[in-house]
Amino acid sequence: MGVERIKAAFENGKKAFIPYVMGGDGGLEILKERIRFLDEAGASIVEIGIPFSDPVADGPTIQRAGKRALDSGVTVKGIFQALIEVREEVQIPFVLMTYLNPVLAFGKERFIENCMEAGVDGIIVPDLPYEEQDIIAPLLREANIALIPLVTVTSPIERIKKITSESEGFVYAVTVAGVTGVRQNFKDEIHSYLEKVKSHTHLPVVAGFGISTKEHVEEMVTICDGVVVGSKVIELLENEKREEICEFIQATKQKEEA
């Protein structure tokens, strides 16, 4: 399915709620169970983190989750095996969030072959500069897996246009300067930034980094096509407050166009 499965998540004015889970945090059975829960709860896409020892874009909550996964001996191969098993039960799109190092250490061809076997539909690589994306982009295109671009508040408009013109899936618009994590509010310029990104791409635009309340979700999906919620979802899963995740999903759905 690949790119098509991601496209379907945004069809007919649908707003996407994209929760992030760390692969192997709590064990691989927990990963599969969490994906099943998020699918049943109505999440649009699930973003699965590949744990890495030097996660430069991650805030403290996601760093801790990654460390727990690594400390428990979870491997990239193990995560792929868990995804292969749970893919038989769910149709929700899978997007991997991975740093470049684990891809190269695993072997990029082997990594992408495993993505195909596991039914992965897209990949986000936060430390892969646009200028160097040919390291993996041609292989991903051949496999029909979207390389999801990230743009930031400080990205010049010409760069945003260039990055998004050759991309697939959706555009991940980083809404804060700095790392991931819970924020209290967003500055007014974020609204104009998101509108600017939307006006210069044919792809859906999804806001991420720092989104942690239902009010944030409602605010963001009035401007763009969806939200990624990472640190807050990890906290809620850890504290068994799953009903709050369901409330986030409902807040997203209520903003869908008629």
Swiss-Prot record:
InterPro entries: Aldolase_TIM, RibuloseP-bd_barrel, Trp_synthase_alpha_AS, Trp_synthase_suA
Catalytic activity reported: (1S,2R)-1-C-(indol-3-yl)glycerol 3-phosphate + L-serine = D-glyceraldehyde 3-phosphate + L-tryptophan + H2O
Annotated Gene Ontology cellular component terms: cytosol
Pathway: Amino-acid biosynthesis; L-tryptophan biosynthesis; L-tryptophan from chorismate: step 5/5
A single MF term (Gene Ontology): tryptophan synthase activity
UniProt enzyme class: lyase
EC nos: 4.2.1.20
Job description of the protein: The alpha subunit is responsible for the aldol cleavage of indoleglycerol phosphate to indole and glyceraldehyde 3-phosphate.
Family: Belongs to the TrpA family.
Family matches, as NCBIfam families: trpA
Subunit structure, as described in the record: Tetramer of two alpha and two beta chains.
Protein name in the entry: Tryptophan synthase alpha chain
Gene: trpA
